[in-house]
Regions:
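Leu/Val/Ala/Ile-rich N-terminal alpha-helices, chiefly Sec-type signal peptides and the beginnings
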Residues: 2, 7-59
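Structured binding/interaction patches within domain cores
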Residues: 37-191
């Protein structure tokens, strides 16, 4: 009888794994939590966050890697549209610069706007510091920040009266206004 690994028993390790019982990186753990096929590139997770965590996971020592465990559930469902992913990529480059990493120039700079490059670059900037305990904590907080970015709210096509308040409250207010503006006889004539 073989023992199967679940998200509750898997230990985080470096690299890509063919199956959970052989270990899992933080992204593979996230795929398990998202109930997706076992992969280090789950569809429901932001590509920028995924790139950051794949690189960071593989560069950490085994002890600090386990600190990534809570992030796996946090990042499920973070995949978003272009605007949010561009903002995440931009923040990754800012995070890198804040850690002292110079951004590439010339043609290489153009590629930094992609999810894979910007996320990996930010993780590498953190890993270059050792990472120190302070930078490790900053990296964990940075992932939380990236995960909290939501798509901008678009203009709704519904009338404000419909989405602005509880419909029951709107009906009560309309009836109260009707009662003030019409007499009892007029109301009976309407019924």
């Amino acid at each position: 009888m073989t023992m199967s690994s679940t998200y509750q028993t898997v230990r985080l390790s470096a690299g890509r794994h063919p199956a959970p019982h052989l270990g899992a990186c933080v992204m593979e753990l996230a795929s398990m939590l998202a109930e997706e096929p076992f992969t280090d590139r789950p569809a429901t997770i932001s590509p920028v966050i995924g790139a950051f965590l794949r690189t960071y996971n593989d560069g950490l020592d085994d002890g600090r890697r386990q600190d990534l465990y809570p992030l796996a559930s946090l990042i499920v469902g973070t995949a978003a549209g272009r605007a949010v992913e561009r903002e995440r990529a931009s923040r990754c480059l800012g995070f890198s610069r804040a850690l002292g990493a110079a951004l590439p120039s010339g043609r290489a700079a153009v590629g930094m706007g992609t999810p894979e490059a910007s996320g990996s670059w930010a993780a590498l900037a953190a890993l270059r510091t050792g990472p120190s305990q302070e930078v490790h904590e900053r990296a964990l907080q940075f992932v939380r920040e990236l995960a909290s970015l939501n798509p901008p709210h678009r203009n709704r096509r519904w009338p404000a009266w419909l989405v602005g308040r509880d419909p029951g409250e709107a009906v009560e207010q309309a009836l109260a206004e009707l009662g003030r503006s019409s007499s009892v006889e007029e109301r009976h004539a309407l019924v």
